[in-house]
């Protein structure tokens, strides 16, 4: 128990999970979301600045594997450029987006209270189309945001 938790008392400790949980509805389902710590959010944002280059390279190789025979490509500085667009930068952006989606989905709480810390982007992609993935991230971001205003009907 933390110093603050001790000061707030036993009742707080019993209800701590509820205090740190918010909900939103989508498609008739109520999703529970763990409000992340500042450190968890900072770790995600820091990853954007410095993603795993091996993962970016894997994404790049998948993007360009069939492009060598396409007309109009330019090979330049260890990159393939199509219509002035760097495939390496595209791969980086794709990887960062998938990372963000996965990390935000991990804030969801399973129906029986289990964490989703073990999921991968492949798990997310097999369950939800990209449009739903982006909607989930948007909804999660709304409820964990400091500007979030909880509305309860009494």
Predicted ranges, named:
Residues 20-28:
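Short acidic-hydrophobic surface loop/beta-edge motif
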Residues 2-17:
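Extended acidic low-complexity intrinsically disordered regions
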Residues 29, 34-154:
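Short, surface-exposed, charged amphipathic helix/loop patches that serve as local interaction elements
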